[in-house]
Amino acid sequence: MVPTEKLAQITERFEYIEARMAAGAAGEDIAALGREYAELKPVVAEIAAYSRARADLAEAEAMLDDPEMRALAEEEIPALKARIPEMEQALRLALLPKDAADARPAMIEIRPGTGGEEAALFAGDLLRMYQRYAEAQGWRFQIVSESLTELGGIKEVIAHVSGSGVFAKLKYESGVHRVQRVPVTESGGRIHTSAATVAVLPEAEAVDIDIPASDIRIDTMRASGAGGQHVNTTDSAVRITHIPTGLVVTSSEKSQHRNRDIAMQVLRARLYDLERQRADAERSAARKGQVGSGDRSERIRTYNFPQGRMTDHRINLTLYKLDQVMQGDLDEVIAALAADDQARLLAEVEG
């Protein structure tokens, strides 16, 4: 049973915000009110539906004492009793604490791991998988920095993804992705195992993370292209070191000004991610290492090409539709990961 007092408080808060926004909310932060309104609206809709169902059940049970209405009540009561637990579960999920970063755009960083050139080629496959997934979601996908190998693989790529609910879905992709297949570079037909690392960070604005100029060191260096050749003769590449944490971010596009912007954007995202991880650890050590924790060293998924199989090791989910997955069909696996995350959070909240 969900405490009715808590439901009443949420509804009252929603009605207050609605009234303040309708009145113009002079002197208040309209944007903050708008965000809270948008967050509470679906919760209040669940509360209203749940309250109506309970009222309908109480009314039907009262009708049992009326001989003329008894037959109708006996017909309605089983259906109402069956619906209420489902609605209560939906309401409990709606009441779960929200990740403040879920609505934010995201930065995706992909780097090859073990496996040499094959790992770099697989990193490129992952990039295209996310591009197709973003397109299917109606998101904007922009590559902000990319370094390629001579065979067209990826040494490193950073992309910016914006749209509705980007980080809420992509956050489950952080970790080590392993591939098992016969590489194009393999003449003997042997299956190799390679890996690539994906990091998904919520975008951070300057107002979220204050980086004093005294905390960073900016170095310029000569940019290199595929195979290590110099792509120009100017020192356009930028390396920014965050002195307090030791974080280092490098960008080597052709424009030094753009490289500074990219490096600062990535640095803000990484520092914001560190703050989030620290806060999560303080809130609950029990959630460390679970789905969505963002542990970059965790092997999360295996893509087995000979068997056409994708396995997500965090929830023991295996799908035999690898071709569709690599074409960006990630809905099923992401939905399963989100459901598992909700179940764990619900268990934690309810003890």
From Swiss-Prot:
Gene3D superfamilies this protein is in?
Answer: 3.30.160.20, 3.30.70.1660, 6.10.140.1950
Q: Which GO terms describe its cellular component?
A: cytoplasm
Modified-residue entries (N5-methylglutamine), positions: Q229
User: What UniProt keywords apply to this chain's record, in alphabetical order?
Assistant: Cytoplasm, Methylation, Protein biosynthesis
Q: Does the keyword Protein biosynthesis apply?
A: yes
One Gene Ontology MF term: translation release factor activity, codon specific
Family the entry assigns: Belongs to the prokaryotic/mitochondrial release factor family.
- What protein am I looking at? Peptide chain release factor 1
Native source organism of the sequence: Dinoroseobacter shibae (strain DSM 16493 / NCIMB 14021 / DFL 12)
Q: Which gene encodes it?
A: prfA
